[in-house]
Amino acid sequence: MMGVQICQGMMSEIPFFSPPPQFSYMMNKNIRLHTDSNIRNTFFTDIGIGISANSLLLLFNIFKLTRGQRSRLTDLPIGLLSLINLLMLLMAAFIATDTFISWKGWDDIICKFLVYLYRTFRGLSLCTSCLLSVLQAIILSPRSSCLAKFKHKPPHHISCAILSLSVLYMFIGSHLLVSIIATPNLTTNDFIHVTQSCSILPMSYLMQCMFSTLLAIRDVFLISLMVLSTWYMVALLCRHRKQTRHLQGTSLSPKASPEQRATRSILMLMSLFVLMSVFDSIVCSSRTMYLNDPISYSIQLFMVHIYATVSPFVFIVTEKHIVNFLRSVCEGDECLNIH
């Protein structure tokens, strides 16, 4: 039973996917999803909020770059994460139209293009979040730490790492360019549905297990790296607080430094990511145990995009320099002339 769940876990990377054993049951539910206006409206509202928030965060990083302000080591990954989440949500919105809206459908090229890009952006979002956590741990590390030597690395090193990971993830998901097709016949049981128009060619149990194992190794490695870097940052913050109280007295509460505020925002982001990953795994397992219950299916549709929707708000709310920068832009353009 555990082996079946692991092999089926591969398809949780693709939205609206139904594992083969419950194909007929889930297919009928998918066809009728467009008639449920509550699920459709809630889903697109969630996607719309995420697109708006990530667009705002991306614009801030672009303005900061064009104005020549001093950038931090984490600025590039934060801007990249907002861009990746923005593109992923746009792909999810396009894919959702083929599930929630009844229409003529797509051809092979559109199916391959949308599902492949969505899969790639989801992987890059995970990778960039991990990179962001590690970089913040490097920034916070003391001079005596072995991580301190990475603090002054040129920005192009980060760009090369991101580019290499992008190529790697594009290669990992390249099998979708072959296996994803336009559904030739809605009544056949030979294809596994992704949406109403798109299906994935059936794979052997061995191939499913192989891809599932590779994806599981990737996810476990990156999430473990995030957890370790998060634990390291928490330990450093606790030690810093104890030292500050010892030197200045417990009656004083010194203002948090920009590095500490940035670290707290990263900690919030990583905690959210880990919680959403665990919750998504639980819901995915419940779908397998309870024959793809439509309630669990609907919950997974929303939960899979919560991180991409909420993450920009974490930076916007906790990063004081974002508010100050936007305020300075408005003052420069005389948009705050309130008498």
From Swiss-Prot:
Its main location: membrane. Coiled coil: none annotated. This is Vomeronasal type-1 receptor A14. It is found in: Cell membrane. One of its GO terms (biological process) is sensory perception of chemical stimulus. Glycans are attached at residue 185. Signal peptide: none annotated. It comes from Rattus norvegicus.
